[in-house]
């Protein structure tokens, strides 16, 4: 058998392209934040993670431009060698303070943050315990480690307890959860997870890629529950509320120091470019100086949740700016996506394995910079499309 046979036999995506219902890798010709353009077709963007709308904020843009002028376009090296600027260390210091931890470590992407952190910490005699809805980067980081992976049903703390009971007391244990689950917009049940972890001698890591800047007055999901000091590690990315690219892990200084010297995804990757680091720093400053943006994005999300529910859509357990429209069928999910796209609304169709079978959905997400007129227009188009294909009465 030829290794490439599977490549030549893979036809699903090409069939979707031929039928005009391929929803991925859409090349936008303009991106103004809340609105985008594809081949001259203007759409309201309800599929972005730009929660605070900071990609177009003047202070963030200017910081990136000035960093390029001062440092150039790239560090052309690993953080471990020549790729660390004072900007990186300044950002690490400010992030640690923002999330209430002793130290932080900046990686080049969020994916690399999880790959480097989890694989560095999990050894042969250790167990990593994952929520079944955890992000793929957490799963891949766990696979790169030499320990054993255990999984429990989504936010099912009774199942988590059974898993912990089954693990030998001698094993090191790390529970990893998304703070804000990225597909359905619900929050990890940290008020129950944290005391259970303490009971079994397990450490807790929260991947707050989607929660940072949104929950806990911007400080994240652990802060929202008053558990910042009780959570051992807090991870986030810069590609959402921070309007940039990169990621970080924060925790006690000895732990961060260890990851710094054992995280292969950090050591063997080029460092995040100056513009990205400067943009993230500026975004953090905007979060401090303009907290009304954090309130605004949550107000917009509540408006849309209520609007969708009044129309008859199922928004699941969403509590955040990620608001799913649960459809439960592949064909209807793609059909709804196509009709919404043609009508001027950009959303993301999500099917298995990204969600469990029967939970296929349209992932919508909202920004602080969406206007009331834009949001009303989105509800109007959803109402029309939903009725046309039988999603709502």
Language model feature labels by segment:
Residues 271-290, 296, 300-305, 309-311:
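Structural motif of enzymes handling amino- and sulfur-group chemistry
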Residues 3, 58, 62-66, 70, ...:
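PLP-dependent enzyme catalytic core of the Aspartate aminotransferase-like
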Residues 62, 66-110:
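Conserved N-terminal alpha-helix of the aminotransferase class I/II PLP-enzyme fold
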Residues 117-136:
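Conserved PLP-anchoring active-site segment centered on the Schiff-base-forming lysine
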Residues 5-73, 202:
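N-terminal "arm"/small-domain region of PLP-dependent enzymes with the aminotransferase-like
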Residues 150, 154-206:
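Active-site phosphate-binding strand-loop segment of PLP-dependent enzymes
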Residues 223-258:
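Active-site PLP attachment segment
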Residues 295-302, 309-344, 354, 358-359, ...:
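Conserved PLP-binding catalytic core of the aspartate aminotransferase-like
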